Amino acid sequence: MDEALIQEQERQLQKTGRYYRHVFWLCVPLLCMACYFYGARPLLLCGIALLTGNLCDRLVALLRHRVYTNKDLSNESFSLIIALLMPATVDIYVLVVAVLAGVLIGKEVFGGYGSYPFNPAAVGYAVAAVSWPEQVVRYPQPYTPLPLWNASAVPVSSTIEDTLRSGGILNLNSLAIALGEFAAPMGTGAALVILACGLVLWTQKDVHIGASASFLITCGLIAFFFPRQVGLADSTLFSSLLPRLQGVRDELHTGAMLFCAVFLLNEPYTCAHHRLGRILYGALVGIATMGFRYFGVYETGVCFALLAVNSVSALIDRTEERLYRLLHRLPSERKEAAE
């Protein structure tokens, strides 16, 4: 492997390695919630995902003739995120393929640490969702006892997305929704835990609030002004204020929206790097996400939206840099002309 590239990756690891360490450990509370809802199977799935990601890291280090270092937890954090985006009933081989796709195709093919244009966790999830939709987008109800190794006989459904798509409102109280007591990917339903994790990442300066806030605000505004619930779009805002707000609540708490806002959107190498660029980036992901949710076939369309906007995040950065230079060059030129 090129020595200059190795040195550059080591510099990047010094700069952003703490982000992946924090994400890795903050996935543990969500895993605990998943085990509370579904038993020991989420622990088995996450363990297999971690093992797969770690073995990929060691294999790539061997093939590229570099020394493996356990300081880099990016593969492990991507693997955990992919596992938490899956239903607790997913077959083990599907999860393994998703992790392999995310780590090898989403990350290593582009050069490894810090060189990838697309979020590797979103790549892994998208590959699994497109290849095995009947396993990836259908979920068991919480508190359903799951066999440890083979959960194929457990009843699963997509009732949450079916309800929202048909114009209905979730028949759940706010506390149940905040705690994640509904059929969803095993690590994405506990909103209170996810928000607490996001607060920790923010206080540790691992993430910038601009992208996440603009993403959630954009999604909320679209859900408020263009609701999917039957009859709300034709009614006035004031007469349907509470149902619209309930629709916003349902949209933001389902489809892994909060989870992606905290754990995927601010990934250091795929998110825009400047303040205004991050706000625009989050807004674009929000628009694309609601488009996928309203007109697509996957409940977790946010992962596909993220991949779509990842393709222009570098363009957003370059455009902002050019505008910044242009706006600061004009006053200096006028000053020189006046002198």
Where are the regions that the model predicts?
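Alpha-helical transmembrane segments in multi-pass membrane proteins
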Residues: 22-29, 45-57, 74-79, 83, ...
